[in-house]
Amino acid sequence: MASTLPPLGGGNGGPHTQHSLPSLPAHLQSDTHITGHLASRFHVSHPTAKLSSHALVCLNTYTSSSKGPDGGKPGSAMAGAEDMADRAWIRLGHRSENQAVVFLGESGSGKSTIRSHLLTALLDKSSTPLSNKLSLAAYVFDSLTTTKTATTPTASKSGLFYELQYDTSATTNPILIGGKLLDHRLERSRIADVPTGERNFHVLYYLLAGTSQAEKTHLGLDDGASGSRRWKYLGHPTQLKVGINDSEGFQLFKTALKKLEFPRSDIAEICQILAAILHIGQLEFESTNNTSATGDDSGGFSHEGGQTSTTVRNKDVLGIIAAFLGVSMADLQSTLGYKTKMIQKERVTVMLDPAGARAHANELARTLYSLLVAWILESVNQRICAPEEDIANTISIVDFPGFAQQTATGSTLDQLLNNAATEAIYNFTLYNFFDRKAEMLESEEVSVAPTSYFDNSDAVKGLLKPGNGLLSILDDQTRRNKTDMQFLESLRKRFEGKNPAIEVGSATAKLPGSNFYTENAAASFTVRHFAGEVEYPVKGLIEENGEVVSVDLLNMFNSTKSEFVGRLFGQDVLQTVNHPIEKSTVMQATISSKPMRAPSVMSRKGGRGRGIASQRRQQESNLFDSGNTHAESRSPKGGNKGGIDQGASGQFLSSLDNVQKAVTDPGTNAYFVFCLKPNDRRIANQFDSKCVRTQVQTFGIAEISQRLRSADFSLFLPFGEFLGMADAETILVGSERERAEMVIEEKRWPSNEVQIGSTGVFLSERCWMEIAGLVDGSAAQGRFALPSSDGYGNDGATPGERDAFGASKEQLLSGGNTPLMYGEKGKPGYFGSDDARSEAGASAIGGGDMFKNFDTREQMAERGNEKNLEEIEEFKDSPSRKRWVFTVYFLTWFIPDFLIRWIGRMPRKDVRMAWREKLAINMLIWFMCLVAAFFIVVFPMLICPKQNVFSAAELSSHNGKDGNSAYVSIRGHVIDLGSFADRHYPSFVSRKTMLNYAGMDVSSLFPVQVSALCQGTDGSVDQTVTLDYKNTNMTGSPALINSQDLNAQYHDFRYFTNDTRPDWYLEQLIMLKGNYGKGTIGYSPEYIAKLGAKRQVIASIGSRVYDLTTYTVGGRRLRTKPGESLPSDPKLADFMDRKVVELFQNQAGGDITKFWNSLALAPDVKARMQTCLDHLFYVGDVDTRNSTRCKFAEYLVLAVSILLVSVIAFKFFAALQFGGKNVPENLDKFVMCQIPAYTEDEDSLRRAIDSAARMRYDDKRKLLVIICDGMIIGQGNDRPTPRIVLDILGVSETVDPEPLSFESLGEGLKQHNMGKVYSGLYEVQGHIVPFLVIVKVGKPSEVARPGNRGKRDSQMILMRFLNRVHYNLAMSPLELEMYHQIRNIIGVNPTFYEFMLQIDADTVVAPDSATRMVSAFLDDTRLIAVCGETALTNAKSSFITMIQVYEYYISHNLSKAFESLFGSVTCLPGCFSMYRIRAAETGKPLFVSREVVDSYATIRVDTLHMKNLLHLGEDRYLTTLLLKYHSKYKTKYLFSAHAWTIAPDSWKVFLSQRRRWINSTVHNLIELIPMAQLCGFCCFSMRFVVFIDLLSTVVQPVTIAYIVYLIVLVATKTTVVPITAFILLGAIYGLQAIIFILRRKWEMVGWMILYVMAVPVFSFGLPLYAFWHMDDFNWGTTRVVAGEKGKKVVISDEGKFDPSSIPRKKWEEYQAELWETQTSRDDSRSEISGISYGTKAQAVVSEYGFPSRPDSTTGFAAHALPYDSRNNSRMSLAHSDMGHHRMSQFGGSQFFNPDDMVGLPSDDALLAEIRDILKTADLMTVTKKGIKQELERRFDVPLDAKRAYINSGK
């Protein structure tokens, strides 16, 4: 029948000219020979071959893909792609079939390049503006999803299904009407994890390289010189310069978006998001202590300085990101610092460490990029996609990333899904060649010789089978929250021994050196893919498959101020699950791994008759879920109940199924392109036979070629159609079949290309084209030229456009230098040359700055920081507040508000007001400090100014011997001889000679010329007058040297000498006083009087002393030069006025100032006399240092010291409380022990809980109440704190009570909180203690730190509960459940509890502490609260803790003991204090009284004072309230009760803790001082204590200044007084030492030394730091603004709280309802509906029931349950018979339901059996446990419920 025509593509030029592989002879059809044939073609520049008409085999030449053997296009890969496009086009037009082109090949084989050539060729067929857009859309897709890898510069990292949509109904020339881009599974992991030597997605590099300088500045990309900043998300800096023209790429990217009709603003927003992603990579995190106090602070002593939190180090980068994303910096930082997860239906917040925060930031970057890509592609599709009903046919291009032997980015999931897709595509390829026509051939009775081939069905079924394939199992296990190991076990069950392609590894392994199996950390499964075996580790696979987007991020972006970011997060691609009750609350979200649209091939199955819009919507949704068992909600807000329906694998599977269905659709004709790499090293023109042979083998090209040799059928034509085409009307005889046979005989086609069936003819494509008259591509192109209309009503495309796309086939962008896979430049197929020319230069938009009309970054940031606020309450300021505000403004008026706003960066008015208040308080404190300093230092100096005088004894002590300085006096002036000696001229007088005069009066060495120094009575004195200088030579006067001293002659320049220099003396004296003066000689008033009595003419005027003795007793003489005669007038020597001389003589020895002032002398005479006195008779100054005034000043300093020490002495005596530590007898009072827990670790919590449980106090009368503040996983913990607590207490994870509402302390809606209640018995070291655990879980809408409201709120839960119990008020659901648990489960009426012990979760209490405290309460009924001594457990962990040890010791044993004397300890530490709940005699509530509870529950904390009270020192404030409202009661310190806590060990936390303490001290003491009733006898009262405390706190810095001042005094003066002061200060520590010596605390000696070294820190540094940081708070979002008529309005972004949203009932009403319900129902165990706040009811009494019971606690209340719970008169376990019976033995370890007793043996039967057992048992070895086990064996039932009876031995 068939002849032997020349085969397809034959030729005569040697073997390499044969381009069709099936046409090779049979002996050349092996892998090796085909590889050889490809090699021979490759070497002559023929890089392609064909598999008949079905497939193209392309070898990557790594040079140009458009050059053939002759340098032209023919023979090139490009020509091959165009040929395929021509044939697809012809079939599309002539047969109206859908066409699909499927690409296969490894990464680096050139798929993307061939794909672009093919797309270009197809779009060239209809050169319209739309084809331009479709080309640009492909470029945008590639920019976003391709990257450079180790194997290729353009590796696609997302599966592409690109659909070109045509209308073929009107003509054989199809009209292009649209396109659709479907991306499958972008490799998101690459964003934050760029493999070494590879790049991230190209668009990120484009952005960095292509933006102008102005744009870079706006985007924050311009740091430093170019290239100096290393971008974490861009890999190694070398990747920025790898020969890809990124700058040009960016211009093209923008151009493409612009031509795709993206608004300019959207393009700019896209760039901002990309920049934000780059910046997210730059964030650096550090672990810090958040020292700003907030209302929801929680935790114990060690946390008080601030919670450990993770913050961003580079805030500038954070600011840029926050601005672009439209959120506030604070929100962004805190959101990155924690992560909310779902753990077993519980929402838990994990406090992240820096590494965790970095991972969270990476997740943000991945989420943003994924959403951005999804949004851009969906926007592109909206612009290019035609309505489904208009589409007649499509051409689809399918190109998925190549097979991956190992993962580059570390994502196993990406690798698995990628390989599953290549497996599916390869399977379809095999199906197409081997099985697709098999059924039809069979039905047409055509037999074809079978061909063997490698079938990958096992792998495909194993991976992709819906329901129980590997991906489906992975999805199912993810949905059911299974672990990786459970997933592995599921795979084992499914595949072991059932599927040869999948091998499951072991879940356990033996570690080296161990004999035991442990969990295998490297557990994996292996899949035998068609391209090789791949081992996939399971670790982290389930979590990765969940791909859950952090709810925290969603929550943050809900309030974004950026409209664009809002659009990104509002897409359908982001699938959310909403809370079943609170619909607005998102519980979980994922980004879909499948495209948001489906292939049109499938969409059209719905029919064409309906309306366009509705039909399309219906089709989209039907299709979207095609192959998907769970219908997926596409509404972003809608969501479903049970969690996300599909994980990544399920979604990918579903989308892959859509692709397969589209390609295998009967109406679709598929072509294949096999891309091969000639070598692995990317070397041009090198052919590695081994490398190529492996690929030929992998893809089964030889088998396919053999198959085509026997059956190359592409079409089936019924006889009629075939004959019509063949123009066979001329053949008139025979049936249709016979006529067809005749035509075929005539055509002489080979038998493998044509076969006749029973109803028609099977043809190859070549034969069809021949018979249809479409012999080659050129004919096709020539024959089917475009018609005049382009289908859009235009007159066809302009010639220019058509030419452009004609030109665009090869090298489009002459300026480009982007190497593609084939080593060519440019972007093939995307841009016309016109586009390139017009817009490749400067930035396409906005003349170099696309952000020209945008908000600046600062404006964006400001917008992001704004909150949406609403009014929540109104109030008026109190008069005292108004007075204080006036004072503040009075003190700070000089600082204008705008300065605080701009320089202090405080936009909020309330924050600025707090700053003013802080400044005012600091000014007052500084003023008090200055007053104190003035009083200590300046005041004494004002009373007794400092005198530089030397007594005779002091002068003589400066004699230059024994290291003393050498001073001399000259006429009353003291000169430093030691300093002057070396400068004495002439130099022949030795220093030693000079120092002989030290300590003496050397006035005699300096004779004076009287006429030069005194002008006498009448204005002149005769030159011959001389005056001797004589000392009195008494013990009080300086020792005068002899006037005959030999050295005197050298200084004698008087008139009668040869060398007369009248002014020499005065000049020398001025020089010596100026340079070497030390002071003057001092004469005390007593000594002057003594001299006067001894006939000395000496007196003082003012402070100066004058001695006229020598003048009066003849010391005046007249002396002339030799040869001159003496003047005759003897009165020449009387140069002083007589009245002056007489005054001195008459008043000698006294102060004559008054007389001098009233002396009757002419003013000029008096002035001359004063000069004479000063120069000739002055001998020194009056020494007042021992006067009463100066003594007072000295002793004032001493008095202050004595005052300080007296207070300490008081404290010392207070501390000397000896007396034996008598251990009190057993007490029968009921005590609650409250432990608030926050983020402590398990060790701390266990220590605290165990120490409380092990206290030596009747276990039945203790109740541990542990309150967990929020569902939070602390740093370093592996579980949330509540779970740690419940695990310690032995509560099973299966116990899950209902969360119940209660009121909390919070802003706005945060006042509504929810909590869970657990109770049971805790067994530890022989103690069995009842416990109640309250877990604050928050409302479902709380995303961040759910339930967390702070330590004060935790205290309030119990305080408010007890308050409502004692006042019989209506309670919230949580409180009713607490009441029920305490009363009906634990069996004690809550009113019985008298005392509450509060300890912190990091505190350990001594075993006898509760007993000692309770006995103190019993001894003194006026005692309301008591605290014990707290020491440190971590004393030696750092220097910071070491300096605190002694301070803790003395603060308790001195300060608190001192305050305790007055019955007013002003600070009871929350870490270890006990309170009296109600008065012993009257039952009146004390600790939980209405006033205390209401004041402590203040929610509006908006002033500096309130914040310091309630946010800094809530413990101290609680004490303040007790003293304020119960002033007749006392608070005491009990030194015999001990606890140990953890102190801050880092400087920052220590600083913060002390800041809190100091400031809260100041503010609390200010609260206490105004209380009138606090004054007592002689002020020895509480107010005295408070005032002393406040004063000492405020002036602490001055005390240090005082000590420093004393040290300086001692150093400068050796007088006795400062030394006395030091002795006193030493006594302070001496007294302290006595205390610890008497207490035998010898180790305190060392700690004391450390403490003394740190005193400057404690007393000076810390207070000053604290006072200035008084306003360092986290101010929250609630703020106060001025309202009308003096009112203030509180506004908040938390929303307004409605108290009625929490239902409240009294216990009696609730119990009556409960009782009614229980009595009206059947005996069967039915559930109560309608009134239960709590868990399901199971027991007769308990409406809340036992699911909330742990499984390992005693039968504490087992027998009490049937008891009428209304009979509350005998509920005390101590005195009720029932209680006694129940408590007689703490056997048993469970709570039992009476219904559990059904089917158990009776007590009598048990007793009989026990007796029987004991008859034969060895009584020495028998145990209760053994007897119980034997009974269980005999009765064959578990007897846990009867354990108490068995153990009782009755």
From Swiss-Prot:
Q: Where is the Cytochrome b5 heme-binding domain?
A: 947-1006
Question: SMART domains attached here?
Answer: Cyt-b5, MYSc
Q: Which residues form the Myosin motor domain?
A: 1-779
Q: Which GO terms label this protein's molecular function in UniProt?
A: actin binding; ATP binding; chitin synthase activity; cytoskeletal motor activity
Entry membrane topology: Multi-pass membrane protein
Q: Sorted alphabetically, which SUPFAM superfamilies does this protein's record hold?
A: Cytochrome b5-like heme/steroid binding domain, DEK C-terminal domain, Nucleotide-diphospho-sugar transferases, P-loop containing nucleoside triphosphate hydrolases
* InterPro entries linked to this entry: Chitin_synth, Cyt_B5-like_heme/steroid-bd, Cyt_B5-like_heme/steroid_sf, DEK_C, Kinesin_motor_dom_sf, Myosin_head_motor_dom-like, MYSc_Myo17, Nucleotide-diphossugar_trans
Catalytic EC class: transferase
Record's GO cellular component terms: cell septum; cell tip; myosin complex; plasma membrane
Residues with glycosylation annotation: 245, 290, 427, 481, 558, 1033, 1058, 1186, 1453, 1559, 1767
Name this polypeptide is given: Chitin synthase V
